[in-house]
A protein has these predicted regions:
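Phosphate-ester processing/binding pockets and catalytic centers
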Residues: 1-205
């Protein structure tokens, strides 16, 4: 049986600096059937139109004003044929991992779960990661492959490619930002109002 291709978009929220960053650091992947990538990308344009944002401009969660607008975004995301995977790190509980290694270390858990989903769905993943200052594709691949035997259950044969791309260049990276940052705000404020964001997408998680 031929495998099915998926595009996986990864972003992060929070600051992983120990003792000086945010309490939570979150990695989020949205998993999209490749044959529906364009269709779902057009839904980002619909969101921008509803918010009166130029479709050529970046959709960025922290720039969106007003609870109703943010809730509209999450309702739209909840209606899409996507799977959302989150890894939530409580940075205040980390004792042995240097802050500059937190992203690499916990991305292993994210990749592990991505490949589990690929295996369950006879799929292969094209992974696109939102660029960040110190993130190197080679370092990421080498880290995951080197530690695969001891820490993670990552089937690298189910990963076709990894690319690191600026967020503004991919609409679905912007959607991943919304999923990740909304979860971050829900945990930060810890109230029913902000948890409504997550209620809208709970069937996708």
């Amino acid at each position: 049986m031929n495998s099915k291709d998926y595009n996986v978009y990864i972003d992060e929220a929070g600051d992983e600096g120990l003792n000086k960053g945010s309490k939570y650091f979150i990695l989020t992947a949205i998993i999209v059937p490749k044959n529906k990538d364009l269709e779902i990308s057009k839904e980002v344009d619909c969101i921008k139109n509803n918010l009166e944002i130029d479709i050529k401009k970046q959709l960025h969660w922290n720039s969106i004003k007003g609870f109703p607008n943010k809730l509209m975004i999450m309702e739209k995301i909840g209606s899409l044929d996507i799977k959302i995977v989150n890894v939530i790190i409580d940075t205040k509980s980390i004792k042995l991992i240097p802050s500059n290694n937190i992203y690499l270390f916990f991305s292993g858990y994210l990749f592990e779960r991505i490949t589990w989903i690929m295996k369950e769905n006879n799929g292969k993943a094209n992974i696109l990661i939102s660029s960040r200052g110190n993130l190197s594709k080679n370092n990421l691949i080498n880290y995951i492959n080197h530690h695969n035997h001891s820490k993670f259950e990552i089937d690298s044969s189910l990963i076709k490619d990894i690319k690191i791309i600026p967020n503004e260049r991919k609409k679905l990276l912007q959607l991943s930002d919304c999923c990740c940052s909304s979860l971050f705000q829900s945990l930060k404020y810890n109230n029913n109002t902000h948890f409504e964001y997550i209620n809208k997408i709970k069937s996708n998680i």
